[in-house]
């Protein structure tokens, strides 16, 4: 009798494990969710935005930790070391570089386009999202931050390279080959992204709790002014008074800060 009971229990266990096997095997790894199960709730978009911002800190930190090493390419400092963690600025300063040179040359290009790709995924899925757990203001805020990030990444590409591809949507098999765009087009895209973000964000300083950890309108105006300043001189080094006036007006419009007398 005991043997029969054991056989019945074993059979029941086998049937149970067989019927539940498919469910068990279909479990998606929580650490790396696929596109098919992502973008389902507000926290997914918050994670995606954080992931987009994380490209700014991607090793070796060409847009963050080692950004000060750009001074090695000026008269402000001298580079004694030539590792990637110094941007390979010694090699760049000597002119001994090619498209495969590591440091700033390759990492800036790679990280900016990786960041732009992440931003496009976020923007496209956010615009299509119909979930009730996200208000219209929250969606507008995230889209504005995504535009600000795209403009920020392109601002580095604009400053470090001459002509680069202008990608404004996720790449597919149909549009993966992108020709280089003119510097004027890249500059216009940066200004458009910054202006769109500035208009959509609440006009609060970074010290405000809502803006902590994000682009504020003031920060974007400062970044915009920096690029405008580089374009305010003619080929002979003479400043354009009209362009300079626009820059001053832009800086004076920053909330919570003011120009020194």
Q: Can you say where each PLM-predicted feature lies in the sequence?
A:
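Short, well-structured active-site flanking segments
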Residues: 28, 158-169, 240
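Bacterial Sec-dependent N-terminal signal peptides
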Residues: 1-31
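Conserved, well-structured interaction surfaces
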Residues: 46, 50, 54-60, 83-161, ...
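Short, surface-exposed recognition loops and adjoining beta-strand edges that mediate ligand/DNA contacts
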Residues: 36, 63-83, 167, 202-219, ...
């Amino acid at each position: 009798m005991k043997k029969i009971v054991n056989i019945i229990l074993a059979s029941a266990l086998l049937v149970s494990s067989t019927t539940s096997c498919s469910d068990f095997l279909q479990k998606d790894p929580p650490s790396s969710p696929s596109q098919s199960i992502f973008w389902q709730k507000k926290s997914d978009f918050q994670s995606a935005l954080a992931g987009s911002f994380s490209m700014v800190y991607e090793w070796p930190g060409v847009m963050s930790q080692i950004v000060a090493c750009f001074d090695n390419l000026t008269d402000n400092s001298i580079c004694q070391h030539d590792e990637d963690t110094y941007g390979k600025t010694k090699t760049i300063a000597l002119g001994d570089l090619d498209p495969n040179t590591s440091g700033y040359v390759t990492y800036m290009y790679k990280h900016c386009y990786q960041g732009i790709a992440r931003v496009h995924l976020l923007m496209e899925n956010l615009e299509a999202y119909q979930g009730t757990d996200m208000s219209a203001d929250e969606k507008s805020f995230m889209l504005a931050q995504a535009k600000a990030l795209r403009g920020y990444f392109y601002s580095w590409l604009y400053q470090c390279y001459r002509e680069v591809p202008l990608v404004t949507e996720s790449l597919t098999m149909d549009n993966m080959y992108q020709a280089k765009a003119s510097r004027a087009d890249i500059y216009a895209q940066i200004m458009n992204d910054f202006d769109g973000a500035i208009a959509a964000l609440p006009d609060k300083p970074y010290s405000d709790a809502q803006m902590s950890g994000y682009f504020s309108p003031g920060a974007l105006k400062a970044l915009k002014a920096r690029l405008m300043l580089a374009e305010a001189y003619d080929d002979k080094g003479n400043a354009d008074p009209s362009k300079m006036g626009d820059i001053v007006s832009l800086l004076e419009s920053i909330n919570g800060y003011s120009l020194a007398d």
